[in-house]
Amino acid sequence: MHMPKNIKVKPHKLEGVYIGNNKFLLTKNLVKGQKVYTERIFKSKGEEYREWIPFRSKLASAIKKGLKTWPFKKGTIVLYLGIASGTTASHISDIIGEEGIIFGVEFAPRVLRELMFVAKKRKNIVPILADANQPETYQHIVVQSDVIYQDVAQPHQVEIFLKNLRFFAKPNAIGFLAVKARSIDVTKDPKVIFREVERKLREAKLQLLESIRLDPYHKDHMMFVVKVPKAW
């Protein structure tokens, strides 16, 4: 591996996120010398940073689009539904550190195998082969979580999200729901679909904190951020 390039790094206003050369997002690499996907690795003042590419991560694109709600810090407990091969999760792993934990639910065995390689080095990621629509099948593994993050391309993704919040959300937990309009209904205008998602979240008595369109990074996607009320 070639030597990481030295760059100028400053903290972003969101905890655990950094900005490189006033341009790109970074997280401090929890496992030095290790890449997870095609990200570049940089050095600054003896620390190693990984580039967080918004075109590869919906959470990074939400940050680029002005996300304000940020529950991730050292020690945060995260349930990640639809973790895939761990691109976004690896950056959350950098931020929450060894004191935190990510329970990563993934339905596709082939993809989960890729995640296993990431989790081997990153002890704060727990891969779970399961269907996010059946939280009862993994309730013996997952603990009550500070954050529930969902990126599941299913028509009934809102229902899956609500079900998991009911099972695993601590009071005042924050939920992130990344919605791809076309996976709900190809025939409908994305705006109509997003309004429908918002209505369902409000009907469930969740506090809607933010809704952010993820264009141009992810076409026809929106990130919804909710807070679970204390007595829900």
Swiss-Prot record:
Q: What is its EC number?
A: 2.1.1.-
Q: What class of enzyme is it?
A: transferase
Q: Does the keyword Methyltransferase apply?
A: yes
Keyword vocabulary terms for this entry: Methyltransferase, RNA-binding, rRNA processing, Transferase, tRNA processing
Q: Name one GO biological process term.
A: tRNA processing
- Pfam families per the UniProt record, alphabetical: Fibrillarin (PF01269)
Query: In which domain of life is the source organism classified?
Result: Archaea
Matching entries from InterPro entries are given as: Fibrillarin, Fibrillarin_CS, SAM-dependent_MTases_sf
Indicate the transmembrane segments per the record.
none
Q: Where does S-adenosyl-L-methionine bind?
A: 87-88, 106-107, 131-132, 151-154
| UniProt-recorded Gene Ontology molecular function terms | histone H2AQ104 methyltransferase activity; RNA binding; rRNA methyltransferase activity
Glycoprotein recorded as keyword: no
For this protein, the record's NCBIfam families field holds: PRK04266.1-2, PRK04266.1-3
Assembly, in brief, is: Interacts with nop5. Component of box C/D small ribonucleoprotein (sRNP) particles that contain rpl7ae, FlpA and nop5, plus a guide RNA.
Question: What family does the entry list?
Answer: Belongs to the methyltransferase superfamily. Fibrillarin family.
PANTHER family in the record: FIBRILLARIN, RRNA 2-O-METHYLTRANSFERASE FIBRILLARIN
Q: What is this protein called?
A: Fibrillarin-like rRNA/tRNA 2'-O-methyltransferase
Task: Record the organism.
Answer: Nanoarchaeum equitans (strain Kin4-M)
Gene responsible for this protein: flpA
